[in-house]
Amino acid sequence: MQQVLQEPLIHWALRSFLAALFATAALSKLTGMEEFHGVVRNFRLLPDMASRAVAMVLPVAELAVAAGLMIPALAAPAALAAAALLGVFGLAIAVNVLRGRTQIDCGCFRNGMKQRISWAMVARNAVLTAMALGAAALLPAARPGGTADLATGMLAGSVLFLLYFSASMLGGLPARHPSTASVKGR
């Protein structure tokens, strides 16, 4: 097991997945700043002025984390920053679920798809936080890797991200109700 945890391919896959997650989230927020400000404000955790500041700074911080994860010298602190951000996001979601405000959008990706918050989303963030903490903890033990490890790890991380993002997109689709479903083909 120890050899698996030291495998550079594992580290690059984990870092690439997290970097893609943060870069995509940041870029989607930067393209819809006003909408994202509304999402932050809708969580009702900060005063309006602070909500605007957070909405402006958060995508930049997410881009910095994404870049840091891909730079070996910065990967460990970037992974810790990723864990901190994911933990705060999970806490903000949990507070609103406890308040019964599950109809609000999480604001994870500003792709036109609304993702209502839930305990499942809190659990998802806990898993992502654990992944980021794992990346930070395992980095010092990683064996040096070659170009093949880097390329394969980045490809694996990208595929994992595409699967994750696809599942998120599908989760944001409105449910079809039997009463509104098409009867085509019958």
Swiss-Prot record:
Top-level taxon in the UniProt lineage: Bacteria
Membrane spanning stretches: 8-28, 54-74, 75-95, 119-139, 153-173
Localisation: Cell membrane
GO biological process: methylamine metabolic process
A Gene Ontology cellular-component term: plasma membrane
Topological category with respect to the lipid bilayer: Multi-pass membrane protein
Major localisation: membrane
UniProt cross-references to InterPro entries, sorted A to Z: Methylamine_util_MauE
UniProt KW keywords: Cell membrane, Membrane, Transmembrane, Transmembrane helix
Pathway: One-carbon metabolism; methylamine degradation
Role description: May be specifically involved in the processing, transport, and/or maturation of the MADH beta-subunit.
UniProt-recorded name of the protein: Methylamine utilization protein MauE
Organism the protein comes from: Paracoccus versutus (Thiobacillus versutus)
Upper lineage: Bacteria, Pseudomonadati, Pseudomonadota, Alphaproteobacteria, Rhodobacterales
